[in-house]
Amino acid sequence: MTLPVNPADNLAALIRCPSVTPAEGGALTALEKMLKLMGFSANRPVFSDDNTPDIENLYARKSGNGPHLMFAGHTDVVPPGDEKDWKHPPFAAAIEDGVMYGRGAVDMKGGIACFVAAVARHIEKHGNIKGSISFLITGDEEGPAVNGTVKLLEWAKQRGESWDASIVGEPTNPNALGDMIKIGRRGSLSGTITVHGVQGHAAYPHLAENPVRGIVTLVDSLLYPAFDEGTANFQASNLEVTTIDVGNKATNVIPNKATASFNIRFNDTWTAESLQAEIISRLERAARDNRLRQGRETPIKYELTWRERPSHVFLTHDEKLIGTLTASVEAVTGKRPELSTSGGTSDARFIKDYCPVVEFGLTGQTMHMVDERVALADLEGLTQIYERFIADFFG
């Protein structure tokens, strides 16, 4: 029996599955075959929710006596866009000059392929693992993330599963393999402000109520002053206005409504609840500011709607997990990785409620881009890092 020890072969098999979210595309089936060659038992639960597509997931475990390590990730990928723009077809896994091209090469089928190869090499060299390893893999990370990791974790917990540590194989390195381990993530909170006015002729503003003046005032209150200056482990919280809409194409008509959406990435100065309270307080004060409203005395009429569920800030403190992975990266690459909390959210935000979690994978320079690609040397390097980590983690 040949074990899946070659990360490039593993990745090619996964890339050739067109698993554009929410489609499974054969990717979980291909992964399940690899894992069963190593003696893993596997389950493929499907989760549903209102107004979202049904999503297939995979949970596989190889049990032993000792700690339980979870590898987590996703096989769904973003659309490739116009395939004519690609140097090689996005689902062909073509190799040119030591580089493999394909959608998901780094985000994050490459990480999965390397961890599979690392486990296979460990088994080939040492036989049984001194503990348990599980793969918790979803097909709903690039989509709404409703029927994926968050439900798969609860499903597994209800069946008696628990974990001592987890690695998420997202592409964490900005420039080169070994640059960065993610040990936490900022929180994320989104909302929409709607200001109601009175439509009218632009030449007769006294007969109308321009909501644009109100939305500008409210948005300004969220942009300044800064929410904080950052903390020891996190950069400063940052709010970005992502849309401003009035639904009005006429230049001589005052609109009757204006909306603005925003997203804020926040640090451990705040909880989602305390940040919501701060935003509400700022808006309430700003609603009484009539400097842009031509002397009107009534407060700005507005509504605030919170969008989706917030992602909570977290920081992992597990010394064994972080120390073992750091030493493994340094041993293979010769450099000590930065421990970082930068970047966006990931499914680690769900896992942190079940066990300590870190993120480490390939280099993310081409993720979501045309000609997404990975150097075969990086696949081998990441596999060696994972293999060393597995050996040291289980002692």
Curated annotation (Swiss-Prot):
GO molecular function, one term: zinc ion binding
Reaction equation(s) it catalyzes: N-succinyl-(2S,6S)-2,6-diaminopimelate + H2O = (2S,6S)-2,6-diaminopimelate + succinate
UniProt-listed Enzyme Commission number(s): 3.5.1.18
Residues given in the record as Zn(2+) 1 binding sites: H74, D107, E170
Cofactor(s) required for function per UniProt: Zn(2+); Co(2+)
GO BP of this protein: diaminopimelate biosynthetic process; L-arginine biosynthetic process; lysine biosynthetic process via diaminopimelate
Biological or metabolic pathway of the protein: Amino-acid biosynthesis; L-lysine biosynthesis via DAP pathway; LL-2,6-diaminopimelate from (S)-tetrahydrodipicolinate (succinylase route): step 3/3
Catalytic site: D76, E141
Cofactor: how bound: Binds 2 Zn(2+) or Co(2+) ions per subunit.
Annotated positions binding Zn(2+) 2: D107, E142, H368
Entries under Pfam families matching the protein: M20_dimer, Peptidase_M20
Swiss-Prot/TrEMBL keywords: Amino-acid biosynthesis, Cobalt, Diaminopimelate biosynthesis, Hydrolase, Lysine biosynthesis, Metal-binding, Zinc
Keyword Plastid: no
Record's function text: Catalyzes the hydrolysis of N-succinyl-L,L-diaminopimelic acid (SDAP), forming succinate and LL-2,6-diaminopimelate (DAP), an intermediate involved in the bacterial biosynthesis of lysine and meso-diaminopimelic acid, an essential component of bacterial cell walls.
HAMAP family on file: DapE
Subunit text: Homodimer.
Protein family per UniProt: Belongs to the peptidase M20A family. DapE subfamily.
Name listed for the protein in its UniProt record: Succinyl-diaminopimelate desuccinylase
Organism (species): Brucella canis (strain ATCC 23365 / NCTC 10854 / RM-666)
UniProt gene name: dapE
